[in-house]
């Protein structure tokens, strides 16, 4: 027997998303709901539109039609479609890209500090000192992903898989309500 989905259990709604690139439809009327505290996978061959869907959710690509609705816990639903990328991140939607995006000339810890949620601008990132709570969160997150002994090393010296874990840690320390991983085991 099927049970009805409670709206407060849904964290992300994808409603009839289509995207066309010069007449070629990469996605056609994709619909799904992502439940809070769950793991979902989009599986398909190369070119199936998995990354394109994540790009639409994060506003990297504009859909031809459809909407993406985010349901943050304890707040009103937010229409992500049409928002700017940085505003989506501030709402609590995290994304780890297929190719690691870390600052290779900074240490692992410095990368983590830059990704802290409270550091919202260039000047904050340069001049604002992280709190003791921030540093504890960084330490525990690095421990969680197995990089605690690499905190003072330059990110560029890490192996590819360690860079993947660093980028995941950079998302986790922001405490997003949802995190999307694009090919996290690639490479």
Predicted ranges, named:
Residues 81-82, 141-159:
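Conserved ABC nucleotide-binding domain
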Residues 67-90, 130:
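ABC ATPase NBD Q-loop/coupling interface
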Residues 43-45:
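The feature captures the beta-strand-to-loop junction immediately N-terminal to the Walker
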Residues 58:
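Helix-to-loop junction immediately C-terminal to a conserved catalytic motif
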